[in-house]
Amino acid sequence: MADKEATVYIVDVGKSMGERRNGRDLTDLEWAMKYVWDCITNTVATGRKTAMLGVIGLKTDGTDNELGDESHFSHISVLSEIKQFLMSDIRELGERIKPSSVDKGDAISALILAIQMIITHCKKLKWKRKIVLITNGLGRMNSENLDDIVSKVKEDNIELIILDLTGRRGPDFDDAEYGIKEEDKDPHKASNETLLRTITERCDGVFGTLEQAVEETEIPRVKPVRPVASFKGFLQLGNPEEYDTAVRIPVERYPRTMVAKPPTASQFVLRSDLAAGQEGPVSSTAVPETQPEDGSNLTNVRNLRTYQVSDESAPGGKIDVERDDLAKGYEYGRTAVHISETDENITRLETTAAMELVGFIQSERYDRYMHLSNTHIIIANRANDKASLALSSFIHALFELESYAVARLVTKENKPPTLVLLAPSIEPDYECLLEVQLPFAEDVRTYRFPPLDHVVTVSGKVVTQHRNLPNDDLLDAMDKYVDSMELKGTDEDGDLVNTPFPIDDSFSPVLHRVNAAIRSRAIHPNDPIPPPARILTQFSQPPEHLLKNAERHLKRLIEVADVKKVPPKAKGRKRAREPEKPLSGLDVDSLLHQEKRVRISPNNAIPEFKQTLAQAENIETMKDAVKQMRSILEDQIRHSLGDANYDRVTEGLGVVREELIAYEEPGLYNDLIRKLKEALLKEKLGGDQRELWWLLKRSKLGLIEQRESELSEVTEEEAKKFMSA
């Protein structure tokens, strides 16, 4: 079970916090809230009911706290009691966090109030307690009863963090470790800084700058994972049921590496006609007419699956079948072979949970590409000294003999067995076996590719000098280029050393980018999502110094390899390009006496539309072709029996869109789709055809925007608005 946590954030919302300083676009309060929001949203993302938060506003216009009758506690408001934060609490707090019109309020009194909140909520139970104070160090601070405050913080084991903001001429608080020192500091503010620093030092807390804290929020937080054993059993050599000399060691198995997957999106529908918390009826599909703007009024979409079989005598030619009436069948060629549940149980392999050693192999003879799974560790059963000694002996034996063990693993009874490799791992204070799954014979894919250093002719002759083989100059140039791109660093003595890929500093861009986007949208539902943090993209490009160092080697490699730039693909209007000439060099059109097309036939609309555009000599011809296609599409919609012609309309409209993008006439298509949408929604084409409009939206056949054609006058926002209606 996760530890219980209670954190109280004290945020300075005084009048001075509404100012912008040091060239920042954000106010001091907005800048401070970047850190607070990051902490809060990370806690909310865990979904833990035992992770609770509280927020206190310092220097507020009014007073709202249980100690407000005393003068020292004026202009301090409890914005949120200690509780589990949800989406609604985030939105409510965002509306209340605003700069006030006063700079009155005692930070020390706010600290006392936070301690009181934690004592009241946590009592004497086992909790992780933390208080975070963010202030610019201005205003009056009461230095009385500091000994009592320090004593209470230590007694209740409360972690205290105090962060400063930026002042008028630079950082308010000095931080020698972070390279910050303010010159000509106001004596009153210097006194406040000394007071706050003294409190944190006596409480064994942290006193730092907000700039450092905000920068550290860019570093993704790796979620701690509580270890859960995937196997508890025996590592055994020999059959203990038949032989007394068999070896059995109680062991446990835990994951060492596991892919961390980003959160997945769930489907919801925006329902304004339902009360909060009320669910809609069960349905197989749900198509919302509008996109939800925030997290409110969302209803779960539940799918209903039905099974049907053909029956000519039934209405509609099909009848429903219950899931319990279904039988399993295995594909055999082009037919299905039925196997009943009774027979299927017989075919299953009966196994018992165990890890049985089947052999050993020299480490140098094992190929690393045989790894087939995540990595696990095998340790002795906890609190079993005899098992620890036995496993340690086995690990050291493998290490000294430079060998690996091969074992047959069954994690649970009657589960399919797997082959695993066991490798010794010995650290100064830790020993274990590293385990990876090995492939069976059917899992190995063996392919043979042509050799890279010689060519075998049809007659069987081996050729080492060939146009498809690199010569010595090319190999030398490539070697020097690769060497120049080698990652290197320096040790404590300044000597060059190879630096491996820093796993501890390489975070999953997809995982943390999705999490950051979710948190950003939760706080600011209408603002654009900020760009990804630099630490997530640092490995998307080689280091600058390596590129500069390898530049001359790359130029020589290009010269030796005779690399030539491929001419860019021709752009522009199709009619402006030269037509492709046949290999015969004959003019096929003149030989066939093909006349220019005037009318487009509804029975062969798409090919004839393309021919008309290819033969068009002016814009009027193209306009006429688009007009004819619009008429044909509207006739297909008007005379469609149900959705019989919807696919034809979608295909035809898609061809018109692609062709007009290629001919750089996006305006013609945009006029067409606007008129078609109006006719569909106003039911001018034979009744309610909204389902067709939904199909066109799903096929992304909306307006041509500027990203798709430079000549388009439609922006991305206009295109989205057009499709959302």
UniProtKB/Swiss-Prot annotation:
Domain Ku: 235-484
Gene3D superfamilies the UniProt entry points to: 1.10.1600.10, 2.40.290.10, Ku, C-terminal domain, von Willebrand factor, type A domain
SUPFAM superfamilies the record matches: C-terminal domain of Ku80, SPOC domain-like, vWA-like
Glycoprotein among keywords: no
Region ranges (Disordered): 277-299, 567-586
Enzyme class: hydrolase
EC numbers, comma separated: 3.6.4.12
Subunit structure: Heterodimer of Ku70 and Ku80.
Function description: Single-stranded DNA-dependent ATP-dependent helicase. Involved in non-homologous end joining (NHEJ) DNA double strand break repair. DNA-binding is sequence-independent but has a high affinity to nicks in double-stranded DNA and to the ends of duplex DNA. Binds to naturally occurring chromosomal ends, and therefore provides chromosomal end protection. Required also for telomere recombination to repair telomeric ends in the absence of telomerase. ku70, of the ku70/ku80 heterodimer, binds to the stem loop of tlc1, the RNA component of telomerase. Involved in telomere maintenance.
Similarity field: Belongs to the ku80 family.
Protein name, entry field: ATP-dependent DNA helicase II subunit 2
Native organism: Emericella nidulans (strain FGSC A4 / ATCC 38163 / CBS 112.46 / NRRL 194 / M139)
Source lineage: Eukaryota, Fungi, Dikarya, Ascomycota, Pezizomycotina
